[in-house]
Amino acid sequence: MSSEAEAVSSAIQETVTAAPAAVPATKSMSIIVTKGSLDWAYPPFILATTAAAMGLPVTMFFTFYGLPLLLKKLDLKLTAAGNPAMKMPMMGAHMGLPNILTAVPGVDAACSKMMKNLMNKKGVASIEDLRELAIEADVRMIACQMTMDLFEYDLDDMIEGPELGGAATYIECATQADINLFI
């Protein structure tokens, strides 16, 4: 595990230790992961690893655009188009881009690079590290078989650990879970 992942793991453990009450062992969580952009990749992995650190069994179901988060090689990007809440700290203020500028070629690449640099500077773990933490915490990951077929992904393209399953596999899990999230 990288030092970045170890730092995140320690931070999660500290958060869990400081939690006012322990979560009953009978609680569980499921997350449908539908988005695979840089900014949308973080919430499901942060919630999954935190819940797992708190002792909850967690299942993540990766479908449609969330499925590429299970690829061995990630190339995460974000788009500023239509995201008025995306204001980056620059020159002592939080500045956003007018939507018209987001149509300029190269803006998404620049925004992605700026976000990755900011995350690195602030010590935010990479998705690769969070994914590794999830696997180490025994988070159950299900790759949607229909999406694999639809987008012609091969199991060899994916990291080791996730199982293949479909909607019925997820629904079976979700009907038993106390917390169900759609991200």
Q: PLM features: what roles do these ranges have?
A:
Residues 42-55, 60:
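Histidine-anchored nucleotide/phosphate-binding helix
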Residues 78-119, 123:
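A glycine-rich helix N-cap at a beta->alpha junction
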Residues 108-165, 169:
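A charged, amphipathic interaction segment
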Residues 2-21:
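Positively charged, low-complexity intrinsically disordered leader regions
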Residues 70-80:
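Glycine-rich loop at the start of a catalytic domain that most often binds anionic cofactors/ligands
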Residues 58-64, 142-144:
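Short internal beta-strands
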Residues 64-68, 148:
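Short beta-alpha junction loops
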Residues 31-41, 70-71, 118-122:
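Short, glycine-rich nucleotide/cofactor-binding loops
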